């Protein structure tokens, strides 16, 4: 796969014609459907007229592409892309998006529109230089001619299709599967060929006012003007906490306030930056586009590459959410007592560290139920018990202190930490806890480094408080933690392999590249982490200058 470095990317944005003239993408100027069209000369089939029409359309498109002299790269190649292109061709039908984006979406066409749709579909995949495969008689088929496609598709009611392209700059976004269905019409209803989450039988009197199956490729959920009960009609924001240990002002403050003793709470590896934030944002743009706004909480200057003019990005300094008496702070526990004070934040938000990276397509349902109940990803095993002890991990002591509050409130004991993964949070619950435990919040807020008497608000207290009060449930999503004391090379390579295979069932929801214990001094660890980040997320996001 051809990957653009920064110099080539700048050239592409500055002068696309020169880029394509000089680059490996030059082959796209000559539309590969020319060879494909040679195989379309099968005129003896019963659908001879329609096949000829398809061939004629493809030939015309080929000539038009030659006039344009190039096909532009595709930034995001997905089901939405093909729906948009089909709408440009005035195709007619409906589409159904699954609640879980790792499942296949469906494109549903009336039987009476089949011939017209197939002409427009073949024209679209030809003009876009896309490769078509589909499952037929239990095997994945690579059709060699329009005749073959028409013969196959006219004999079945539905088919799983795969579209792929060489026009993306990353192999992880170069293909997708969807289901093509042909619906039968009765005088009173339309019958879909397979069941779906809305309704398999669509009564015609229910579509009088919404023009479904009348114009364009429309979302099937438009059978009502109201949101569907499984859909989320609330905004979700994203919050990062970020620090740059190379920031000069931060370094001066750190030297001034750093205690004489060393611990994991003061280790510089905790504050090391490899531009993980850049890659985390790339992963969210690729896999979590449902996010409304991204808040980045920091006491450092924004990185030079970050585009603060992007309307989705808002930089939040500590003094905007924390009192002056608590500043400066170098404690994540302290910062996490105040995230719900971010101005303008939605009641529903996802809290993520910059070392948490998404690995597959996600939507709101991965983090919240449609009724607002949060989804937690607690570890499968318990780890929290006993009393706070000097010298033991600060995250564990923070959880122990939180556990004491939970036991008093709910008369139950808890033991499970949250996995190293994005956390589903609600500001109303955080405000409620702050009001209920003012002394513990205030004490943690004013500790400049993680301390023995901290409470872990987002690391422990929130999740179990929400769970025990009926406002959160455990999720079955898998996550991956990678540390230098693991077989990290094997773990990272496995994620890369599964991503290339688009094996969403086995891919974790996220992977955490977890620094600590002076991991920044481990050269092999640093090399493998950087290689992983650049391999999985090579393309700049819209959040970069």
Curated annotation (Swiss-Prot):
Additional observations? Stealth proteins are part of a protein family that is conserved from bacteria to higher eukaryotes. Family members were first identified in microbes as proteins that help pathogens to elude the host innate immune system. Microbial stealth proteins are involved in the biosynthesis of exopolysaccharides. Stealth proteins are predicted to function as hexose-1-phosphoryltransferases.
GO MF annotations, alphabetized: transferase activity, transferring phosphorus-containing groups
Recorded protein name is Capsular polysaccharide phosphotransferase SacB
This protein's species is Neisseria meningitidis serogroup A
What are the EC numbers? 2.7.-.-
Question: Which Pfam families has this protein been placed in?
Answer: Stealth_CR1, Stealth_CR2, Stealth_CR3, Stealth_CR4
Functional note: Part of a capsular biosynthesis operon and has been suggested to be the polymerase that links individual UDP-N-acetyl-D-mannosamine monomers. In serotype A the capsule is composed of repeated units of (alpha 1-6)-linked N-acetyl-D-mannosamine-1-phosphate. Non-polar disruption of this open reading frame prevented capsule synthesis.
Q: Which GO terms describe its biological process?
A: polysaccharide biosynthetic process
- Enzyme class, broadest EC rank: transferase
Coiled coil: which residue ranges?
none
Question: The organism sits in which domain of life?
Answer: Bacteria
Family of the protein in this entry = Belongs to the stealth family.
Key word Transcription present in the record? no
Q: Which keywords fit this entry according to its UniProt record?
A: Exopolysaccharide synthesis, Transferase
